[in-house]
Amino acid sequence: MNDENLIKEMKILQDKIEELNIKINFLIPNQKNSASSYLAMESLKSPLWPEAVDPSMICDINSEEDKVERANSVIDLYIEENLRNKKFLDFGCGEGHIVITAYDNKASYSLGYDIKDVFSPSLKEKNKDSFTTDWSVVEEKGPYDIILMYDVFDHLENESEVDVFNKIKKVLSAQGKLYVRMHPWTSRHGGHIYNECNKAFVHIALTESELEYFLGKKINSKVNKNFYPLKKYRDTILATGFNIITENIVNQELEPIIKDSKIIEKITKDYNFMDKPTFQLGVNFVDYILGK
């Protein structure tokens, strides 16, 4: 046997050893779902498996330029009115780039609120009165003509969705509008782990223990597992008395490789869906404009 053939044989042997290690280290201790788990992992490894997010659309968390560009995109494409001379609140503002972008768009006042001080130090230093973790400050500075809640609803902690919406309603002006982008956990990128693994539905296709094994590390994804998101959103809005001005469901059809895979059956079984959740999996976002 020549060297080239020997290398090929060794590669085949290494692959078989790796497969055997998976079975020994994971599948055998978890025999209940061993077959479906293994098939799911093999499907996700395929280069043909769709990405969760187009890489060109992922904001580089280490790039200030990317963060500013994202903030501009949210204001320009999502808020359907001029901010000039209006009071603006970004609920769940994170580092706060959208808060500053609102000022760039001539808002008379812009405030960023978050439950934790994760504000950008440089932005906060230059705009000390524009960031707070104290809700009483939000109330004091209100009411607001435009309130943004962008990709926050599905991450709420410590308070119910109804309580949060009621709080927001109290600081919204009589003719004001609440812009809400919902990002369901059931969407292809709803786990927010595309920086670690940019595979569509990986956060749902694998259980937490399976995902930890698949990635070789534990991922702390703080997203509320809402299996029927559209109902949850509508029920919350109804319970708080907001009027729905517009509701826009942003769908993406499931690719054949996903539809035809055993992963759909695994998801259905793992999360006790009565039927295959193809509708839920096809909803990427739900956008609302709400008023009093």
Task: Map each language-model feature to its residues.
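Conserved class I S-adenosyl-L-methionine
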Residues: 86-94, 179-206
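Class I SAM-dependent methyltransferase SAM/SAH-binding core
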Residues: 95-137
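A conserved beta-strand element that flanks and buttresses the S-adenosyl-L-methionine
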Residues: 148
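Acceptor-substrate binding/catalytic loop of class I
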Residues: 217-232
